[in-house]
Amino acid sequence: MSWPGLLYGLTTSLSRGLALAPQLWAARSMATLNQMHRLGPRKEPPKRLGPTEGRPQLKGVVLRTFIRKPKKPNSANRKCCRVRLSTGKEAVCFIPGEGHTLQEHHVVLVEGGRTQDLPGVKLKVVRGKYDCGHVQKKK
């Protein structure tokens, strides 16, 4: 917006009692003392943390491995595992890559990042760390 436009909007809004104020003055007015007393101090909304609670990775123990079916247009079987995280929570994690040797009681490193076609799966197992080996090269 240009300066002449702002000045024109200001003069017209002042002459008409702020009825046609530009967006510059469209914010809400200040709260009254009664409203501030009733509502109390402003509360910061809590930060929305993902399943790793703000950490980049978490260590976990595999409870069981299983296969999940993806959502509608896709048809492959996705390898997943149930993991007890170091925070004490249990979560379902996707195992990326072809072929894995994960079994019960294996220790894995888990990172955030959802699998788009698996509803409710928001974590991935990191390959090549702890008991989860690297993806093997095809021969």
Curated annotation (Swiss-Prot):
Q: Provide a GO biological process annotation.
A: mitochondrial translation
Location of this chain's protein in the cell: Mitochondrion
What Gene3D superfamilies does its record include?
Answer: Nucleic acid-binding proteins
Task: Quote a single Gene Ontology cellular component term.
Answer: mitochondrial inner membrane
What residues span the transit peptide?
1-29
Which terms are listed as keywords in the entry?
Answer: Mitochondrion, Ribonucleoprotein, Ribosomal protein, Transit peptide
Q: Which Pfam families match?
A: Ribosom_S12_S23 (PF00164)
Q: Which InterPro entries does the annotation name?
A: NA-bd_OB-fold (IPR012340), Ribosomal_uS12 (IPR006032), Ribosomal_uS12_bac (IPR005679)
A GO molecular function held by the record:
structural constituent of ribosome
Q: Which family does it belong to?
A: Belongs to the universal ribosomal protein uS12 family.
> Subunit details for this protein?
Component of the mitochondrial ribosome small subunit (28S) which comprises a 12S rRNA and about 30 distinct proteins.
PANTHER family in UniProt: 30S RIBOSOMAL PROTEIN S12 FAMILY MEMBER
The name of this protein is Small ribosomal subunit protein uS12m
Organism of provenance: Mus musculus
